């Protein structure tokens, strides 16, 4: 049974429902939690959140959680963000700005640089990203759009191995299956390998 999902966008960026509306819908589905992950500031085309917006959203999440707790409602919002992975593998926002988050979904959106580079360069950049202590979930790992564009070249076996190594050291690194019918990314062929490496899979809409 699906208990929740961690990669969800609200009207604060490019989603179609408010935070409260999404929380209500999740509760109606019987979910135990909902993770918010609006776009980060660099992705202005999708109304990415400024650092001040991030703080405001964090306060809204905290207020909703406190209200449910006071009423005995067994439901929790997690405050995350879909932080862009930049071309060198660094993450959008400063470390301090990301530290207020419950989770970070790291994703590549600035594709022109990535599609021009070879597999080794892209793999190194992704590994740099996942090694950041604030990084939690690798979002739509190849950036592909089914029927639209191929993903960028990357050695996902190497990336998943490194995630597994970090998990063995006590960190939590998760790979996403983005279940949008336009993405289905992570490709199913890597799911067993992720499990073998000790990398949890997060299924998100």
Residue ranges and their predicted role:
Residues 1-2, 44-170:
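Extended substrate/RNA-proximal surfaces in nucleic-acid metabolism proteins
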Residues 3-15, 36-41, 137-143:
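Histidine-centered catalytic micro-motifs
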Residues 5-21, 111-117:
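Active-site mouth loops of central-metabolism enzymes
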Residues 7, 26, 38, 77, ...:
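Divalent metal-coordination and catalytic microenvironments
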Residues 20-35, 59-68:
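Alpha-helical scaffold segments that flank or form the walls of functional sites
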Residues 30, 170-172, 198:
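Glycine-centered short loops/turns at secondary-structure junctions
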Residues 180, 199-205:
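Short acidic/histidine-rich active-site segments
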């Amino acid at each position: 049974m699906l208990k929740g999902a961690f990669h969800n966008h609200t009207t604060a960026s490019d989603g179609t429902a408010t935070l409260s509306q999404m929380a209500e819908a999740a509760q109606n589905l019987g979910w135990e939690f909902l993770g918010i992950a609006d776009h980060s500031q660099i992705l202005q085309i999708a109304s990415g959140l400024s650092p001040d917006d991030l703080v405001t959203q964090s306060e809204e999440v905290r207020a909703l959680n406190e209200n449910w707790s006071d009423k005995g409602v067994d439901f929790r919002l997690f405050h995350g963000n879909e932080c862009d992975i930049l071309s060198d593998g660094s993450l959008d926002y400063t470390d301090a700005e990301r530290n207020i988050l419950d989770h970070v979904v790291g994703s590549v959106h600035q594709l022109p640089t990535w599609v021009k580079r070879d597999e080794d360069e892209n793999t190194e950049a992704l590994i740099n990203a996942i090694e950041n202590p604030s990084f939690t979930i690798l979002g739509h790992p190849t950036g592909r759009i089914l029927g639209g564009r191929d993903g960028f070249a990357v050695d996902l076996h190497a990336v998943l191995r490194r995630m597994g190594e970090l998990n063995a050291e006590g960190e939590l690194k998760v790979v996403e299956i983005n279940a949008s019918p336009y993405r289905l990314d992570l490709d199913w062929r890597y799911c067993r390998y992720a499990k073998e490496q000790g990398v949890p899979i997060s299924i998100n809409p």
